[in-house]
Amino acid sequence: MVLEQYFLLLPEFNLNTIRVSNNPSGSAAKPLFMYNRDGSICYYKSTKQVDFVRTFGIHKVTFMKHLEQGTYYLNKYLFSMEELPNAEQSDMTVEQVATMLDIDRVTNNKNKTLVSFSVAVTLINIETKEEHKFPSLGTAVKFLKNGSYPADQRTLVKRINTNIPYHGFTCHKY
């Protein structure tokens, strides 16, 4: 306690000397860019991450993941800290880019499974070699039940990639 009082009362000691990394004001920040998948069009650039988060509704964790790993956001957009020399600046407004992202989110989310741990499977008929692809085990079980088979999801899980027949089908992840 005495040490705290000493530092608080000492006039030349400054407690506000913390340097903020990635300064949110953008004064010392590196520029960030949003390109199309092949990097030929630059849709947006800013020195602040918060602009991408607030303006376009991209979650900060999602933004950082795609920025750091170099993966494509919505399988279409590339975030980068480097300016690509051959990229042309888009003439779209910020509102148009935000609308484009909203439309792509709806389209992309329709193609996703509802549960992140869902397993996409293929059932292959042993006799005809006909393949039936399903986005989840549940839909594969419904298919088997509609074919008058007493199907069970637990048993189907055990048969994935084992080549053990289940009601005339083999089950594989895809």
Curated annotation (Swiss-Prot):
Location in or out of the cell: Mitochondrion
Question: Where on the tree of life does the source sit, at the highest rank?
Answer: Eukaryota
Which BP terms does GO give this entry? intron homing
SMART domains (UniProt xref): IENR1
Q: Which UniProt keywords apply?
A: Endonuclease, Hydrolase, Intron homing, Mitochondrion, Nuclease
Entry GO MF terms: endonuclease activity
What are its E.C. numbers? 3.1.-.-
State whether keyword Mitochondrion applies.
Answer: yes
Keyword Transferase in annotation: no
What Gene Ontology cellular-component terms does the record carry? mitochondrion
Task: Name the family the entry cites.
Answer: To endonucleases of group I introns of fungi and phage.
Main function: Mitochondrial DNA endonuclease involved in intron homing.
Question: Could you share any additional remarks the record makes about this protein?
Answer: Encoded within intron 3 of COX1.
Protein name per Swiss-Prot or TrEMBL: Probable intron-encoded DNA endonuclease aI3
